[in-house]
Amino acid sequence: MDVNPTLLFLKVPAQNAISTTFPYTGDPPYSHGTGTGYTMDTVNRTHQYSEKGKWTTNTETGAPQLNPIDGPLPEDNEPSGYAQTDCVLEAMAFLEESHPGIFENSCLETMEVVQQTRVDRLTQGRQTYDWTLNRNQPAATALANTIEVFRSNGLTANESGRLIDFLKDVMESMDKEEIEITTHFQRKRRVRDNMTKKMVTQRTIGKKKQRVNKRSYLIRALTLNTMTKDAERGKLKRRAIATPGMQIRGFVYFVETLARSICEKLEQSGLPVGGNEKKAKLANVVRKMMTNSQDTELSFTITGDNTKWNENQNPRMFLAMITYITKNQPEWFRNILSIAPIMFSNKMARLGKGYMFESKRMKLRTQIPAEMLASIDLKYFNESTRKKIEKIRPLLIDGTASLSPGMMMGMFNMLSTVLGVSILNLGQKKYTKTTYWWDGLQSSDDFALIVNAPNHEGIQAGVDRFYRTCKLVGINMSKKKSYINRTGTFEFTSFFYRYGFVANFSMELPSFGVSGINESADMSIGVTVIKNNMINNDLGPATAQMALQLFIKDYRYTYRCHRGDTQIQTRRSFELKKLWEQTRSKAGLLVSDGGPNLYNIRNLHIPEVCLKWELMDEDYQGRLCNPLNPFVSHKEIESVNNAVVMPAHGPAKSMEYDAVATTHSWIPKRNRSILNTSQRGILEDEQMYQKCCNLFEKFFPSSSYRRPVGISSMVEAMVSRARIDARIDFESGRIKKEEFSEIMKICSTIEELRRQK
């Protein structure tokens, strides 16, 4: 039957229909090919916004650098990065005046964090630029490689395990005349296969030592690798994002810790909180502005958009902010926090893989690596690419582009929020000294501005003043993309406010459905998503019930586990029917074994195994929860696991779900094809790393695991732990004397081997 879509909306208030206009159903667009073009765009744009600055040359690397700070004030509405140092410092001073002690207290909190943070903090995060191999790696591997290189070059402060000591090594590494690194390479050779007598290519992986001089090392240490941001909805063009190397990460972490601590104390900051807490915080600011404007004043809200926030921010400005925020603090603390912005004002952007050329006529493909862009003849490129390359050439060194102004995406979200809030703070009447005043919300580059004034002229004047004040610190409010409404209706970080926040349910759509981890986890995640949306996103009972039925249907099609009494034929139906017929209590079968669905919206919080346990046949229970089942490679499963769910915007977020280990919680094996590539050496390192960590966790179950104090290696810690445990077990009679002495002998042997090594 045909449904007239307008009928659906007759009874729906307009604000609730907003979510139907969002581009959030279907697959998001992904990028293919290299990100080189996007990165060049970023570099060229950033320099264009700051073009009236001063050019200098970095004495260590020879990179040309553009410094727009205190540059000419803009005379038009074009975006520009000419922040004025004195204005930024004054904004900081007023922020401190309105929040007495805020900087002081945040510094004290951060100092404590700095002294306690361990190096393993840097293993969090996904892809990281690994400077030793000059490409991206998982964070843990990149860190291990960096530490390995540091130690072989006589930098050993990191052995204490404290992040601050690792950073001391980073500083020292920059003073060394040369550094020796280990790189992976592969040899190919043609050999005859004995079985088939055909020629085959054999690949062997080697590691070779390589010396890097000071200049090359500095370039690598200051390099941000770039990639294309994937899965961005609602955009025609892709854009580049950056991933910094291990030298920069630790310093950034401490700066962001300080800025986070400040943001927590600022009522206008949308970071670092999220979800319902964020909504409550925002609602407070709106309430304040509306209460004060009841009778005499008008109140308007701008749903704000800034032009190219990152590309107009400047690390030198952040340095000025940090210098001000940490005044009166100990010298070591000020130094460690000022390194991140200094490194960023000397940063290099790696241009990625380069360009792919193909000749349709000759069926040839060839890749032009980024390193060649400086010297290659431009006649091969089309016009737009040619322009890009010409523009970027003066900035190129070894396939990286010098990029002093601008901040790459997502590096200093917290600190840039502090800057934004400091301008919102200037809207108080005591600072505007006139009839209009403003307040608002800031979350990284997103803002909402609420202006109150006795009449429309006052509102206009207030907005103009805000706009011009922002220009002074390198923030460019976009007049084209911002819009103004009577206070009570606005959008901020994809929250829609209409006399209270409206649930924007469409944003959660991508996280509904079957995740594809395994049968056990998928069932659990699916129902948890529905439960969470009932709690947080106005998912009503009828819709939730429907979502649940759709989910079960989707799940059965994904795993081909239709009910045992169904007519649908799949390649699993023979086995499932047999199981169905043998089972006395059919209600006890899991959905993934062809059982019925017992979920409804009242019991979504109960894992399926627990829900059906009492209904199961005894032998089915035994098979389902059997740790000795040879077909299952079991993880030791905590009671709560984390799944990564994809909301429609923002990063993938982690969601907890209950995990019950059954024969359905399998872990798929690693793809074999990686074993024949140059990644193989890295994979072996990674597996060794994994094995060590797993072993360590066996000795220190999480309940008894405290942060190690003092310097002891993992091996020493495990040996001493083994001795203590063995003694306790022996004295309580859990192990025999022979076993006890054998354990002690093994411990001594390990220590002996360590001494010989």
From Swiss-Prot:
A motif (Nuclear localization signal) lies at residues 187-195, 203-216. The keyword Phosphoprotein applies. Residues 249-256 are annotated as: Promoter-binding site. GO terms for biological process: DNA-templated transcription; symbiont-mediated suppression of host gene expression; symbiont-mediated suppression of host mRNA transcription via inhibition of RNA polymerase II activity; viral RNA genome replication; viral transcription. Residues 55-64 have a biased composition (Polar residues). Phosphorylated by host PRKCA. Keywords: Eukaryotic host gene expression shutoff by virus, Eukaryotic host transcription shutoff by virus, Host cytoplasm, Host gene expression shutoff by virus, Host nucleus, Host-virus interaction, Inhibition of host RNA polymerase II by virus, Nucleotide-binding, Nucleotidyltransferase, Phosphoprotein, RNA-directed RNA polymerase, Transferase, Viral RNA replication, Viral transcription. Its EC number is 2.7.7.48. It comes from the Viruses. GO terms for molecular function: nucleotide binding; RNA binding; RNA-directed RNA polymerase activity. Influenza RNA polymerase is composed of three subunits: PB1, PB2 and PA. Interacts (via N-terminus) with PA (via C-terminus). Interacts (via C-terminus) with PB2 (via N-terminus); this interaction is essential for transcription initiation. Interacts (via C-terminus) with human PKP2 (via N-terminus); the interaction competitively inhibits the interaction between the RNA polymerase subunits PB1 and PB2. Belongs to the influenza viruses polymerase PB1 family. RNA-dependent RNA polymerase which is responsible for replication and transcription of virus RNA segments. The transcription of viral mRNAs occurs by a unique mechanism called cap-snatching. 5' methylated caps of cellular mRNAs are cleaved after 10-13 nucleotides by PA. In turn, these short capped RNAs are used as primers by PB1 for transcription of viral mRNAs. During virus replication, PB1 initiates RNA synthesis and copy vRNA into complementary RNA (cRNA) which in turn serves as a template for the production of more vRNAs. This is RNA-directed RNA polymerase catalytic subunit. It comes from Influenza A virus (strain A/Kiev/59/1979 H1N1). The gene is PB1.
